[in-house]
Regions:
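Alpha/beta enzyme core
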Residues: 1-129
Length: 129
């Protein structure tokens, strides 16, 4: 599985986290990337944070399955980072839809743990060998 468009693993600064494919030059580069990953034998490709118009074009051009993340509902499939869709963070990219708010539960659990440690309630006898 390949990955084109926004590459969070390669972003060095927050300014690198922006939609790709707005300029003709970027579009041509991303189409070239698609061709390269197809030639290399990828069985599918994640298309991340590109314009909807470009994602639609990539899906039409592609010989392999396209998986969108912040791309287009016309991709062959969709993906979100688990931590994003579960609501681990208060700030998310525009394309993230939170399906839960786990962050509030995590915050409560950490505060309770801290309190139990400070008050010496944890570890108790049943938590020690």
């Amino acid at each position: 599985m390949a990955h084109i468009g926004l590459m969070p693993q390669q972003a060095k600064h927050s300014k690198d986290y922006k939609v790709k494919g707005r300029s003709l030059e970027e579009q041509e580069l991303i189409i070239s990337d698609l061709n390269a990953v197809e030639k290399s034998g990828a069985f599918s490709v994640v298309i991340e944070a590109v314009t909807e118009k470009l994602a639609n074009k990539l899906t039409k051009l592609s010989k392999i399955k396209t998986i969108g993340i912040g791309a287009s509902k016309k991709c062959d499939g969709q993906i979100l980072v688990t931590e994003d869709l579960l609501g681990f963070f208060s700030k998310n990219a525009k394309f993230v839809k939170k399906y839960a708010d786990i962050s509030s539960y995590i915050s409560k659990a950490v505060k309770k743990f801290k309190s139990d440690v400070i008050s010496r309630k944890f570890p108790s006898k049943k938590n020690i060998y």
